[in-house]
From Swiss-Prot:
This is Indole-3-glycerol phosphate synthase. It is an enzyme of class 4 (lyase). Keywords: Amino-acid biosynthesis, Aromatic amino acid biosynthesis, Decarboxylase, Lyase, Tryptophan biosynthesis. GO terms for biological process: L-tryptophan biosynthetic process. Its EC number is 4.1.1.48. It catalyses: 1-(2-carboxyphenylamino)-1-deoxy-D-ribulose 5-phosphate + H(+) = (1S,2R)-1-C-(indol-3-yl)glycerol 3-phosphate + CO2 + H2O.
Length: 261
């Protein structure tokens, strides 16, 4: 399965990173860093649906998504079009991301940044803060309940937010027991990479009303956005649809059309 391959690769990658930049060095780096931007606040209180726009070059299922890929230029377009948060893929082997993308984007925008990667070691949480992330993605399919609790605690202690991702009811029940506040429903099955917005509709009734809900993956049209707004979700995370657009600005305007009526 793709997820298993990614996790195996990630474990080896993190071992190398720990040698290259020891945790003690990262801890020193984050001591004097500015307070994280409020990722949580960016996802609530909007008349429309909040937009987390993703900087994404490729994926295991689709290959290269954007050939002319300039992460800083893409982030600038997102800022110009007033997205609420930016997701930056840093996984290098399967998604062709890079930690430098996050660092470079941090320097040019004040929008809250989500580090999109596969967190399997506490080291990566501290690393995320040092790279400039305001929030991290924690994937239920990749973590035990014990790890999920510990990782959310570490993130909170160093002042960054956790977007906790689920794909099925079993994962949802597990993460609700860990106190997750921002819940992402991944419409894409990470084991098969099949995608359907029905996943959001199926899981939403089981999520307490005080949670912030983000629908992720498979969102392509204004009709999709209106459907998700009717479901009552707070935000969407969108990557491929924006990356494939001839004009990011025009695509965002199309997606948002009529949502504030």
């Amino acid at each position: 399965m793709i997820l298993d391959k990614i996790i195996r690769y990630k474990k080896n990658k993190v071992k190398e990173e720990k040698v290259a930049v020891p945790l003690g060095e990262i801890m020193k780096q984050i001591e004097d860093m500015e307070e994280a931007r409020n990722f949580k606040a960016a996802l609530v209180g909007r008349e429309s649906i909040s937009m987390i726009a993703e900087v994404k070059k490729a994926s295991p299922s689709k290959g290269i998504i954007k050939k002319d890929f300039n992460p800083v230029k893409i982030a600038a377009e997102y800022e110009k079009n007033r997205v609420d948060a930016i997701s930056v893929l840093t996984e290098d082997q399967f998604f062709l991301g890079d930690n430098r993308y996050l660092q470079d984007i941090r320097k040019m925008t004040t929008i809250p940044l989500l580090r999109k990667d596969f967190m399997i070691d506490a080291y990566q949480i501290y690393q995320s803060k040092a790279l400039g992330a305001d929030a991290i993605l924690l994937i239920a399919a990749a973590l035990t309940k014990k790890e999920m609790i510990a990782f959310q605690k570490i993130a909170a202690e160093i002042g960054i937010y956790s977007l906790v991702e689920v794909h099925n009811k079993e994962e949802l029940e597990m993460i609700l027991e860990t106190g997750a506040e921002i819940i992402g429903i991944n419409n894409r099955d990470l084991k098969t990479f099949d995608t359907t917005l029905d996943r959001t509709a199926e899981l939403l009734p089981f999520i307490p009303k005080d949670k912030i809900v983000v629908s992720e993956s498979g969102i392509k049209t204004n009709q999709d956005m209106k459907l998700l707004k009717n479901y009552g979700i707070n935000a969407v995370l969108m990557g491929e649809g924006l990356m494939r657009a001839d004009s990011i600005g025009e695509k965002l305007r199309e997606l948002r059309s009529g949502l504030c009526d």
